């Protein structure tokens, strides 16, 4: 069993003038045994610092870090039974694949040579690199080197894997292959895993749950679909998803949201969810924007196509409201067969069941999009 718990964990550094720099502030997380949790956020948000505190490479300023019932504060990195995989493969260039994978076991355990050899060979079989055992790192591709780095962690048979952007040095094709490989390995091994990334695709496709950080604070923890469809606040709404959610600042006048270039009438049911908020931000995902059709019951507006980005299977269409400021643009995704071009006049519709509304002052979500009343979806996004 390996349940990892962060209880109000804080990390504070001291600058040259003696002032405090709060890198991580009161983060609380319960990571279940065997769970794959992804820590995601922009550069400098505190995700790698959080991972390094878990590993024992950074001290915890305040709060408590536990592995099951064992408090890890003050426990050295080598005594935590936690293995870490870095962005840099950090392989010994003069050692073979076998030597790189066995070195840690030879130096820090009392395991007999036969058992070390067996562990290395079983792990290389699992990773599909058994034919590379006698090669040096300089003779390996980037993907092969990453597999060796993973294998070095796996042979330790740790309670927890920590991975700090391990795929960022690979090209796009290899990253896609390794995402699948990592998910397969983690499922087979059943080891609790915490994975740090800034990559949207990795966050959405790899984790059982996603923890979104910004400016050292935890913004939301949930399944990938939960964070995508039901963001807690403006930051999560704007950060999760590519292209990102369209966000329009405005105000409430009676039952109408008034934005730059468009007025959006709200139903009574939506209005009732807003409390006393008057300053609002309206959000809608690009895939929920309908282009070129006037649909009854949906709010439809005149727009002009600014730029079209063909992506093969779909297009990212950047538009602006005809009656709005030229600087206020938004995005719709359409099929790859869509025939719109820059300069075209068209219409866009924002279905009310697809919009999000956020408090203009706090950024907190007041209304998230409606989802189908499907038992499987509801169960998935509410865990």
From Swiss-Prot:
The lineage of its organism: Archaea, Methanobacteriati, Methanobacteriota, Stenosarchaea group, Halobacteria. The keyword Ribosomal protein does not apply. This is Xylose/arabinose import ATP-binding protein XacK. It is found in: Cell membrane. Belongs to the ABC transporter superfamily. Carbohydrate uptake transporter-1 (CUT1) (TC 3.A.1.1) family. One of its GO terms (cellular component) is ATP-binding cassette (ABC) transporter complex, substrate-binding subunit-containing. ATP binds at residues 41-48. NCBIfam families: PRK11650.1 (NF008653). GO terms for molecular function: ABC-type D-xylose transporter activity; ABC-type L-arabinose transporter activity; ATP binding; ATP hydrolysis activity. PANTHER family: MALTODEXTRIN IMPORT ATP-BINDING PROTEIN MSMX, TREHALOSE IMPORT ATP-BINDING PROTEIN SUGC. Keywords: ATP-binding, Cell membrane, Membrane, Nucleotide-binding, Plasmid, Sugar transport, Translocase, Transport. The gene is xacK. The complex is composed of two ATP-binding proteins (XacJ and XacK), two transmembrane proteins (XacH and XacI) and a solute-binding protein (XacG). Induction: Transcriptionally up-regulated by both L-arabinose and D-xylose via the pentose-specific regulator XacR. It comes from Haloferax volcanii (strain ATCC 29605 / DSM 3757 / JCM 8879 / NBRC 14742 / NCIMB 2012 / VKM B-1768 / DS2) (Halobacterium volcanii). It catalyses: D-xylose(out) + ATP + H2O = D-xylose(in) + ADP + phosphate + H(+); L-arabinose(out) + ATP + H2O = L-arabinose(in) + ADP + phosphate + H(+). Part of the ABC transporter complex XacGHIJK involved in the uptake of xylose and arabinose. Responsible for energy coupling to the transport system. It is an enzyme of class 7 (translocase). It is a peripheral membrane protein. InterPro entries: AAA+_ATPase, ABC_transporter-like_ATP-bd, ABC_transporter-like_CS, ABC_transpr_MalK-like, ABC_transpr_MalK/UgpC-like, Mo/tungstate-bd_C_term_dom, NA-bd_OB-fold, P-loop_NTPase. The keyword Amino-acid biosynthesis does not apply. Residues 4-240 form the ABC transporter domain. Its EC number is 7.5.2.13.
